[in-house]
Amino acid sequence: MMRLLLLLFSINAFAHISSGVDVFFQEKKYESLNGKRIAILTNHTGVNSKMRSTIELFLEHANEYEVVALFSPEHGIQGQHYAAESIDHSHENKIPVYSLHGKTRRPTPEMLEGIDVIVYDMQCTGVRAYTYPTALFYIMEEASKHNIEVIVLDRPNPIGGLTVDGPMLEDKWRSYIGYINVPYCHGMTIGELASFFNEEYNIKCDLQVIPMKGWKRSMSYRDTGLAWIPPSPNIPEPDTPLFSSSTGILGELGILNIGIGFTLPFKIVGAPWIKAKEFAEKLNGQKLPGVFFQPFYFRPFFGLYKGLDCEGILIQITDPKIYRPLSVQYLLLGMLKSLYPKEFLKRLETTSGKDLFCKANGTDAVYEILLKEKYAVWKLIEIHQEERKAFLEKRKKYLIPSYN
């Protein structure tokens, strides 16, 4: 018992910010729900700074309102399901849990019947290609049709609020893993994204965002003092999102092992046909800011190249504030093509992962440049540069002032 008390004290003592759910209950904003029937879209990451479940908090204060439904995203309400796994409806605390990653990804009229308010509280990864924000956007679209209020309890962007990098989303590649036209790394919180989506896409949802207190755009997740709960099985640490923003898309090609199936998800890139020392030396010779590439040797336990000796690199981020995730991705791809053209292009041309790769990128330009351009790196870096500049201007009015 004493150990548990010490743990809870230490978590609370080092929390430097208050997340949206903290603010909601500290300031008794739940009183605005009196007389209403509410639903909550959340999962295991929905906790306050003392590690108390968002569901538990809403139920504890449900004297004048009623929690009538829960919605769960990819990986399920407890986070134990695999990526892309179809999940059935269930019950939690005798409340129906409607899965939005099973037979339907949108709440049906039957699910929404009698609901006055839907609350969203989940930790995402700070990149466009992640299904949790899309689950919210689908909720907002359906809520607008049924005159249901949506409350978003804001949370930190684990990549920070200053990194804006990567391609925009072209309409052709709009999908559940990338639904709105923002850069791959957008530098916005989920609350800011919700406001952006509501206005830019003319959703007209009755939206309320509960901002955090104390969070600043320059913060890393560790700076917040909040405990990190892995939002999905392969995002185990608070710095993993920064690595996954560089290598996650590479994994969709199905030709490189990116640490899925090993102990370092998203932090390594390798294959049996790569020479580690040569690859690392050429990458480091480009002197990208904030990163060092260490030669690395490994044998995956499962997944791509299971049981085979692989060589590649371990990404060491030396300065997160100047690290450019997509520049790293493009350098990795361009250097692989330059050093191992036969092996790389043969696999690129025949991969079954082209569609997922383009959906994650939000464009097929990356794939086409890799296929056709002899010197691909700088062509890749130039993708959507002007569009990103325009986005930086457009997003300004949606940024929460207290975060600056």
Regions from the language model: what does each represent?
Residues 215-296, 300-305:
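Glycine-rich, aromatic-lined ligand/substrate-binding cores of catalytic
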Residues 174-246:
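Conserved anion/nucleotide-ligand pocket segment
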Residues 78-83, 151-173:
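Glycine-rich, charge-decorated loop segments at or immediately adjacent to ligand/cofactor-binding or catalytic sites
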Residues 124-136:
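Glycine/threonine-rich flexible loop motifs
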Residues 66-74, 153:
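Short internal beta-strands
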Residues 270-383:
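Conserved functional hotspot residues or short segments at active or partner-binding sites
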Residues 2-13:
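Sec-dependent N-terminal signal peptides
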Residues 83-115, 127:
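Glycine-rich oxoanion-binding loops at beta->alpha junctions
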